């Protein structure tokens, strides 16, 4: 600090104020030290696009603007459609964002209309897979990308489960969760796992219990005391709050640090980005567990 005061003392009269401000700025910078790098991790978004209903050309610009501002590492999309006069929605967003993408549908390539799920990423892709979930009569899928996040591989999965609210729907979702977990076990290659999508079930529903036995709920982990009235179904379209869109994470490898809703305000009077809200979360890599202490012979 003394050398800074000496420098101030050499300033001429009319430059005194400017020198004082510069000296104080340098002193503040010296006291603060180098800026700390954010802890390593990733951000992810999940969002049900509501396919091309209502005014898709206007909605897509709103969605694109928000995603450009956030620049998440990965984006899971549901209700993605392509058909005559509607370019594949995931492809359009990926191209505008400069992201890679993976689209999966039960409709065969070349069909005039295809409907399914997608993953978008700004990170290098190490592996990609897709899978048609059992039972095949329900037309549900999962997309998978293994991406490199600051040199560490992370598996991200996007899915959309059965929407029925009766006992049959619950049974089908349970079957889909079991198949999803088997697919993850076969493709994750011992890298951390994040699973995002529209699960059509509350996080504590019995349908998802097998999933919750292995993975944590990112939004619920961050907002543990403030969940009663939270909904990811857009309250403009649905009366009762229902949080059915989730980002699950592998709790022994990742930590949920932040989470919030997206697209939960109209972009114009009576106009919304979707009939769902999106979910954004920031995950941090968990520190490696300490090695067990050596025991005396």
Question: Where do the protein language model's features map onto the residues?
Answer:
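N-terminal, active-site-proximal structural segment of metallo-dependent hydrolase catalytic domains
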Residues: 4-12, 16, 20, 26-96, ...
């Amino acid at each position: 600090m003394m050398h800074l005061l000496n420098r101030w003392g050499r300033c001429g009269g009319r430059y005194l104020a400017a020198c004082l401000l510069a000296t104080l700025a340098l002193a503040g910078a010296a006291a603060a030290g180098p800026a700390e790098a954010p802890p390593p991790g990733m951000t992810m978004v999940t969002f049900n696009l509501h396919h091309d209903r209502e005014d898709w050309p206007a909605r897509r610009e709103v969605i694109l603007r928000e995603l450009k501002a956030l620049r998440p590492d990965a984006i899971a999309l549901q209700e993605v459609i392509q058909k005559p006069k509607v370019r594949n929605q995931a492809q359009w967003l990926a191209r505008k964002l400069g992201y890679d993408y993976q689209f999966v549908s039960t409709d065969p390539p070349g069909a005039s209309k295809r409907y399914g799920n997608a993953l978008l990423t700004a990170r290098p892709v190490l592996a990609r897979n897709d899978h048609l979930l059992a039972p095949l009569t329900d037309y549900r899928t999962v997309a998978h990308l293994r991406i490199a996040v600051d040199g560490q591989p992370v598996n991200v999965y996007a899915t959309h489960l059965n929407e029925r609210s009766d006992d049959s729907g619950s049974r089908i979702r349970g079957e889909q969760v079991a198949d999803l977990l088997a697919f993850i076990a076969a493709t994750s290659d011992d890298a951390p796992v994040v699973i995002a999508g529209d699960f059509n079930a509350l996080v504590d529903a019995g349908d998802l219990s097998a999933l919750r036995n292995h993975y944590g709920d990112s939004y619920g982990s961050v907002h543990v005391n403030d969940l009663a009235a939270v909904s990811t179904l857009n309250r403009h379209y649905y009366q009762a709050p229902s949080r059915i869109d989730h980002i699950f994470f592998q709790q022994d490898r990742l930590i949920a640090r932040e989470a919030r809703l997206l697209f939960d305000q109209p972009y114009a009077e009576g106009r919304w980005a979707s009939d769902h809200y999106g979910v954004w979360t920031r995950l941090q890599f968990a520190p490696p567990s300490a090695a067990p202490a050596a025991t005396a012979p």
